[in-house]
A protein has these predicted regions:
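Phosphate- and other anionic-substrate recognition elements at nucleic-acid/protein interfaces
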Residues: 1-127
Length: 127
């Protein structure tokens, strides 16, 4: 028996996160701060899968905190997402449309993606 995931796409910016839930078709905006992210993650079901576009360093807090809470997290390259948008005939490029596109991408292509996991501790020391 396959357990279905609760799929959420999150568009990340320096100041704000915009999420879109595939199952409920609801959008939500929150500040890109650890306290706000923590509150938002606490509201998500345990079987949530989150798809995020790699955005400089602004996505790291969300990705790391979601991973620590046990969520499946998928980090997508912006170039890959841009090509996916073109492939499905998408033209809009807003935070809300990006969040929706990320959720759709994970829903349709998720079986081909590998969940994110933190790099080895030695990597942090090298930086």
């Amino acid at each position: 028996m396959r357990v279905e995931k609760f799929i959420i796409g999150v568009d990340v910016a320096k100041v704000e996160l915009v999420s879109y839930c595939e199952e409920t078709a609801q959008q939500h905006s929150l500040k890109n701060t650890k306290p706000e992210i923590r509150k938002w993650l606490a509201l998500q079901p345990a079987n949530t899968a989150i798809c995020v576009e790699a955005t400089n360093v602004y996505h790291l807090d969300l990705v790391e905190m979601a991973y620590e809470k046990g969520f499946a997290v998928y980090v997508v390259d912006g170039y890959q997402l841009s090509n996916y948008r073109k492939g499905i005939g998408g033209r809009a490029k807003t935070d809300a449309s990006d969040a929706c596109l990320l959720a759709r991408f994970l829903d349709r292509e998720g079986s081909l993606l590998r969940p994110w996991s933190p790099p080895p501790a030695v990597y942090s020391k090298l930086q």
